[in-house]
């Protein structure tokens, strides 16, 4: 046997050397699928299907991998990965490359094996699909699940019809019949219907199988011609139905080791024209047995107990069998190899011996060649050399077949001989033998008349006394007992009649006529003299039993007498139940095979034999209860020994006490009408009947009165129930009203909560809106702030530009003054040079005066330089203080601007902001007014200063006139005047600078006037100028102090203005 592992390969060879399957197993190849992981595992195959040619098959594993195996081309290919397990496959569509696969998600998909693409996707099932049946044309398919079956058109892949069923009745299988347009549906209640495919009209329904072999069908198979249906289930029986005659024509019983059938399939043959004779039966042990349904012979089998088969599929031409094993692998079998022993020709009938020509005359050199040849042989026969196994074999099959050919009945003597040889009749023919032995007339009309009288009043309440689980068995027992009571009145009062008839009713429950006639025959023959002492037990019969027991076992009888056990205890229970309480079904049937085959006295002998065979346990019984229990329950006793003992007693009992001398021979029931049965004390029965009738009438009166009372009570109860119902209804209405009110309150609370949630949502939306508005407002404020900052920066830039312009003008003025000073110095030096030239003549004269003058000049120059240094130091201090004040003012402005910006960010309301803007505007206007006033004041101060300058100019002019008079001190004046000319320039320039810093800028003409005025001072005398410059110096310092004070006040006002605006 070759083995192939698919592994991770998507294509390859199935076998690598020519397969040579062994005759014993017929396996061509074993296919397994292991993963190539580090820890490999087996991927189990779940389903397999052949195509219409039978040379290709597809198989799917539980991971959804679907492979195509070409047995002729020795190739396999992976055609699809569905990623989920497949539950059914079909590969015989009219497009040869397409196949159907049912998946675990209840869907059906159609794929192409060549293109490996999805052709269609069909949905509609709500449970797993376990069967796909394709029509012979390949254009229609039926998919079956546990709750529905659906018919699909494979040209359009649309659903045509859907078969719905009740939830209590499940579907076993729905499939197409071959070579026809018929759909066969099999349900879990064993009902089988045939439907027309086009119209879905029910063509016929198969009848129910016989109850003697009633099994629940699980699996089905049909021959290729669609004429025979095989059905099996959880049993070893196989039912064969003829679909043309619509009846069950054969039941095949498999060997006892087969307990359940899991799969059935017919093996096709090319020469049987579709009427397949070989059926493959897969049982629960994993072995698939192939049997001939005509000869019931086992032909061959595949699988074993160690390597069992899970499911199998046979190719359409019958050459291959594909089986999925229980270990998940796939086996391919060769049918030709498996049937090789069966199909081989028989051996030749004639063997020819040929003499060879002699080469030497010596007889020792004689050589004889023996060859076998076939001259002629009979027609080929499978049965000639086949070792057959009969599935169901009866011991007397050939004998009974010969006897059954007699039409007048069986031979009783031969039956007795057969019975003594085997101990019992064959189960298959027991009922037929009993009917022949009892010579039942089968009076259908008479029995129908008895049945038509209905249920006898004595057995109306039979189920109360004998509660039988089976309703059918109870009805049959009731009808049988009623027929007996209508036949003879005594049977309506016989208390043990149900016990007597029950085993026969259970045995013949499907044929009530035979049941009645068997019981009636039993009563007439084997119950003779039972009713003579009615209603007491048959004392005469019991006396016969006691006499026979006394003759054969006195010790046992004495034991019964010692313990006060009478024949009514050790014999009557066995008779009234006809041994059904103490024997099993098989033992009871075996016993009555012998009872019905012998004289009626055999039954009495059987009672004695039962006691004698049970003498050991009976001798150990000491209490009466133990004896009662013993004769009412089954005991460990060999019924064959009891029967043999009964035959011994029948032969060895003396004639004077033998029961057959007092019992009549067997008398059969008359044909047409049943005989009159009056072997009972009629007056007692009539009296009991009259009394019973009277009691019945009294009971009827009582029942009528009780019925009236019950009706009244019922009315009262009904009224009470109605009142109670009304009250309950009112209470329910009240509770419902309360419930509704609570529901309304709850709904109102829910509404309030919803409104609250809605209000919360609205608040959140409002808050979000406010946040958005606030963000927009902040963005607007930021934009305005940015615009303000831009405006402030522009103003700062403008101010800085003006400051730079002012500084440049000041620097240019300073440069002009320096140039003028340099010019004055040059003029001074030129004038001094001229003066020195003029005074060289008188230098000697004035040498002494010059020395004095030089000393005086040195002192005065020292004093004047000290004054200049002091003045310069004071000017520097004033300039530094002004600069510090300006820096402080600018820092205060910056701080004020920062505070204004911070204050603007804290404004949230437009109205408040507008008011602030208005207030700021008002303050700005007031500030502008104040600035105008300050500016006007500064202009007034400047005008006053110009007036003072004019006064000083006038005073200087007068001083010039006076200086012209001081000719004596001209030399000293000139020297002193040079120094005085420098001092006024230094003082006037800071004055101009201070006034220019305070007011913004000064006219250049005023500075030029000051310079021209300082030039005119050279004509003033030294003494007068000294006094005048001292007074002017003091006045100038006072004015500088006032100017500084005003600047400080203005700077403080600028710093306090933002605070006023903020308020």
Swiss-Prot record:
One Pfam family per UniProt: RabGAP-TBC
Compartment list: Cytoplasm, Cytoskeleton, Microtubule organizing center, Centrosome; Cytoplasm, Cytoskeleton, Microtubule organizing center, Centrosome, Centriolar satellite; Cytoplasm, Cytoskeleton, Cilium basal body
Gene3D superfamilies named among the record's database cross-references: Ypt/Rab-GAP domain of gyp1p, domain 3, YVTN repeat-like/Quinoprotein amine dehydrogenase
GO biological process, one term: cilium assembly
WD repeat residue intervals: 33-74, 75-116, 117-157, 158-200, 201-248, 249-296, 297-334
GO CC terms, sorted: centriolar satellite; centrosome; ciliary basal body; cytoplasm
Single Gene Ontology MF annotation: molecular adaptor activity
All copies of domain Rab-GAP TBC, residue ranges: 424-599
Keyword terms: Cell projection, Cilium biogenesis/degradation, Coiled coil, Cytoplasm, Cytoskeleton, Repeat, WD repeat
Region (Mediates direct interaction with PJA2): 1050-1053
Annotated coiled-coil segments of the chain: 699-951
Function description: Molecular adapter which is involved in cilium biogenesis. Part of a functional complex including OFD1 a centriolar protein involved in cilium assembly. Could regulate the cAMP-dependent phosphorylation of OFD1, and its subsequent ubiquitination by PJA2 which ultimately leads to its proteasomal degradation.
Protein name: TBC1 domain family member 31
Organism: Bos taurus (Bovine)
Organism phylogeny: Eukaryota, Metazoa, Chordata, Craniata, Vertebrata
Gene: TBC1D31
């Amino acid at each position: 046997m070759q083995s192939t592992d698919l592994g991770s390969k998507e294509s390859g060879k199935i076998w690598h050397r020519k397969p040579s399957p062994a005759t014993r197993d017929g396996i061509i190849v074993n296919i397994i699928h292991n993963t190539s992981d580090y820890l490999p595992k087996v991927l189990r195959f779940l389903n397999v299907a052949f195509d219409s040619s039978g040379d290709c098959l597809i198989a799917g594993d539980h991971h959804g991998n679907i492979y195509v195996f070409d047995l002729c081309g020795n190739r396999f290919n992976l055609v699809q990965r569905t990623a989920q397990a497949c539950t059914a496959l079909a590969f015989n569509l009219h497009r040869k490359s397409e196949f159907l696969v049912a998946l675990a998600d209840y869907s059906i998909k159609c794929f192409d094996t060549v293109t490996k693409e999805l052709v269609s996707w069909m949905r509609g099932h709500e449970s797993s699909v376990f069967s796909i049946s394709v029509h012979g044309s390949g254009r229609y398919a039926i998919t079956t699940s546990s709750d529905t079956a659906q018919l699909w058109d494979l040209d359009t892949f649309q659903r045509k019809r859907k078969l719905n069923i009740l939830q209590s009745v499940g579907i076993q299988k729905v499939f197409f019949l071959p070579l026809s347009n018929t759909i066969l549906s099999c349900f879990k209640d064993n009902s089988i219907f045939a439907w027309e495919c086009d119209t879905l009209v029910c063509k016929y329904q198969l009848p129910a199988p016989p109850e003697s072999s009633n099994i629940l069908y699980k699996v089905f198979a049909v021959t290729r011609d669609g004429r025979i249906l095989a059905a099996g289930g959880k049993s070893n029986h196989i039912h064969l139905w003829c679909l043309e005659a619509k009846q069950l024509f054969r039941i095949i019983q498999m060997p006892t080791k087969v307990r359940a059938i899991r799969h059935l399939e017919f093996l096709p043959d090319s020469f049987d024209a579709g009427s397949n004779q070989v059926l493959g039966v897969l049982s629960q042990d994993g072995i698939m047995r192939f049997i001939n349904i005509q000869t019931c012979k086992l032909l061959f089998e595949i699988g074993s107990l160690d390597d069992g088969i899970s499911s199998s599929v046979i190719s359409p031409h019958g050459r291959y069998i594909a089986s999925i094993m229980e270990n998940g692998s796939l086996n391919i079998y060769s049918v030709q190899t498996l049937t090789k022993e069966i199909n081989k020709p028989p051996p030749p009938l004639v063997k020819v011996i040929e003499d060879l020509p002699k080469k030497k005359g010596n007889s020792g050199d004689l050589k004889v060649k023996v060859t076998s040849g076939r001259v002629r042989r009979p027609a080929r026969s499978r049965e000639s050399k086949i070792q057959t196994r009969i599935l169901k074999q009866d011991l007397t099959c050939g004998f009974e077949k010969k006897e059954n050919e007699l039409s007048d009945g069986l031979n009783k003597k031969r039956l007795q001989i057969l019975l003594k040889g085997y101990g019992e009749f064959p189960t298959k023919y027991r009922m037929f033998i009993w009917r022949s032995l009892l010579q039942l007339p089968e009076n259908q009309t008479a029995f129908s008349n008895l049945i038509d009288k209905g249920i006898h009043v004595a057995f109306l309440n039979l189920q109360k006394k004998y509660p039988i689980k089976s309703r059918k068995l109870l009805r049959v027992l009731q009808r049988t007992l009623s027929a007996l009571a209508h036949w003879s009145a005594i049977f309506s009062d016989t208390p043990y009649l149900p016990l007597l008839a029950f085993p026969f009713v259970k045995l013949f429950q499907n044929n009530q006529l035979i049941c009645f006639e068997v019981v009636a025959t039993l009563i007439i023959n084997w119950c003779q003299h039972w009713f003579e002492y009615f209603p007491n037990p048959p004392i005469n019969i019991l006396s016969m039993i006691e006499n026979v027991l006394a003759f054969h076992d006195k010790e046992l009888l004495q034991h019964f007498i010692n313990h006060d056990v009478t024949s009514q205890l050790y014999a009557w229970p066995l008779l009234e139940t006809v041994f059904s309480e103490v024997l099993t079904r098989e033992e009871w049937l075996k016993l009555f095979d012998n009872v019905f085959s012998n004289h009626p006295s055999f039954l009495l002998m059987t009672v004695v034999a039962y006691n004698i065979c049970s003498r050991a346990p009976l001798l150990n019984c000491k209490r009466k209860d133990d004896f009662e229990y013993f004769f009412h329950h089954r005991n460990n006793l060999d019924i064959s020994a009891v029967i043999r003992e009964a035959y011994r007693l029948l032969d060895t009992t003396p004639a004077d006490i033998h029961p057959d001398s007092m019992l009549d021979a067997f008398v059969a029931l008359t044909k047409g009408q049943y005989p009159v049965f009056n072997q009972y004390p009629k007056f007692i029965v009539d009296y009991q009947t009259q009394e019973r009738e009277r009691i019945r009438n009294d009971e009827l009166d009582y029942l009528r009165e009780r019925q009236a009372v019950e009706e009244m009570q019922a009315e009262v109860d009904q009224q009470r129930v109605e009142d109670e119902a009304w009250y309950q209804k009112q209470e329910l209405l009240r509770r419902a009203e309360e419930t509704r009110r609570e529901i309304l309150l709850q709904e109102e609370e829910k509404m309030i909560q919803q409104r609250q949630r809605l209000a919360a949502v609205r608040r959140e939306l409002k808050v979000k809106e406010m946040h958005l508005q606030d963000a927009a407002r902040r963005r607007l404020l930021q934009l305005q702030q940015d615009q303000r900052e831009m405006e402030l920066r522009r103003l700062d830039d403008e101010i800085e530009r003006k400051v730079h312009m002012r500084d440049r003008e000041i620097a240019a003025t300073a440069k002009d003054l320096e140039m003028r000073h340099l010019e004055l110095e040059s003029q001074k030096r030129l004038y001094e040079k001229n003066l020195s030239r003029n005074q060289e003549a008188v230098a000697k004269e004035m040498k002494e005066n010059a020395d004095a003058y030089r000393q005086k000049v040195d002192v005065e120059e020292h004093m004047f330089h000290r004054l200049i240094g002091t003045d310069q130091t004071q000017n520097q201090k004033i300039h530094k203080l002004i600069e510090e004040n300006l820096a402080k003012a600018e820092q205060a402005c910056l701080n004020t601007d920062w505070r204004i910006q911070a204050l603007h960010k804290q404004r949230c309301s437009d109205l408040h902001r507008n008011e602030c803007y208005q207030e700021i505007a008002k303050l700005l206007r007031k500030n502008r007014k104040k600035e105008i006033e300050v500016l006007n004041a500064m202009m007034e101060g400047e005008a006053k200063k110009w007036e003072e300058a004019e006064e000083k100019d006038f005073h200087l002019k007068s001083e010039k006139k006076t200086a012209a008079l001081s000719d004596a001190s001209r030399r000293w004046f000139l020297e002193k005047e040079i120094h005085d000319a420098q001092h006024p320039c230094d003082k006037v320039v800071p004055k101009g600078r201070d006034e220019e810093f305070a007011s913004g800028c000064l006219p250049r003409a005023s500075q030029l006037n000051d310079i021209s005025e300082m030039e005119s001072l050279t004509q003033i005398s030294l003494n007068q100028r000294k006094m005048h410059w001292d007074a002017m110096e003091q006045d100038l310092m006072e004015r500088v102090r006032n100017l500084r004070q005003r600047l400080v006040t203005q700077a403080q006002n600028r710093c306090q203005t933002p605070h006023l605006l903020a308020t």
